[in-house]
């Protein structure tokens, strides 16, 4: 009987100790979580990717391509992502990108022109923002 009482006492005490440890680990975070807000440039890049993915499909199907969307010109003045800088390198690459992008619409060899535009994207992203390079490479028309 004494052994039974000792066992119950030990179990009771050990259960109480775990409760206090659990309570200390369940504290609420003191910092408020902030949702990511994409910059104008990040949103523009996403729109251009979507458009070029659709353009890629049109080229493959030999459909009419339409014309260069005007919003592509916003690459020259869209607000950059925090920590990124609009410098001469970026401005030169942006100008070259717009040139290669616009050439697609009047080209006799749209596949080659399109792939040149993809090269232009990658050449800038290698220096400025490497994250989306693998995604951009998927635009190539083989």
Which residues does each PLM region occupy?
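C-terminal motif of bacterial Sec signal peptides marking the signal peptidase cleavage site
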Residues: 13-14
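Sec-dependent signal peptide recognition
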Residues: 1-7
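The canonical Cys-X-X-Cys-His
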Residues: 117-129
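Extracytoplasmic c-type cytochrome modules immediately beyond a signal peptide or single-pass transmembrane anchor
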Residues: 18-118, 133-142
